[in-house]
Amino acid sequence: MTRSAKKGPFCDGHLLKKVEAAVGGKDKKPIKTWSRRSTILPDFIGLTIAVHNGRQHVPVYVTENMVGHKLGEFAITRTFKGHAADKKAKR
């Protein structure tokens, strides 16, 4: 079930403070965050946000198409190594 429209999008307060400081100061350094649950707001457009994927921070450059999605959608947590090869087919 999706979030109620009357509540509005969720974004962590500490992330909003960092974004406001970056926009006001014209700082180009990536904003580090562990908040994968935060919704991308229009204020984030043009910023690089380093989202934690459980192991490291993945830089995500925010564009207009990303608004309304969650930050965690753009930092993949699982690495796919490929399926096991069939030993009979190799011979």
Curated annotation (Swiss-Prot):
What task does this protein carry out? Answer: Protein S19 forms a complex with S13 that binds strongly to the 16S ribosomal RNA.
Which species is this UniProt entry from?
Cupriavidus metallidurans (strain ATCC 43123 / DSM 2839 / NBRC 102507 / CH34) (Ralstonia metallidurans)
Q: Which Gene3D superfamilies match?
A: 30s Ribosomal Protein S19, Chain A
Q: Name one GO molecular function term.
A: rRNA binding
Query: What are the record keywords, sorted?
Result: Ribonucleoprotein, Ribosomal protein, RNA-binding, rRNA-binding
Under PROSITE patterns, the record lists:
RIBOSOMAL_S19
Gene Ontology annotations of biological process type: ribosomal small subunit assembly; translation
Q: Which family does it belong to?
A: Belongs to the universal ribosomal protein uS19 family.
Name assigned to this protein: Small ribosomal subunit protein uS19
Query: Does the record's keyword annotation contain rRNA-binding?
Result: yes
Gene Ontology cellular-component terms listed: cytoplasm; small ribosomal subunit
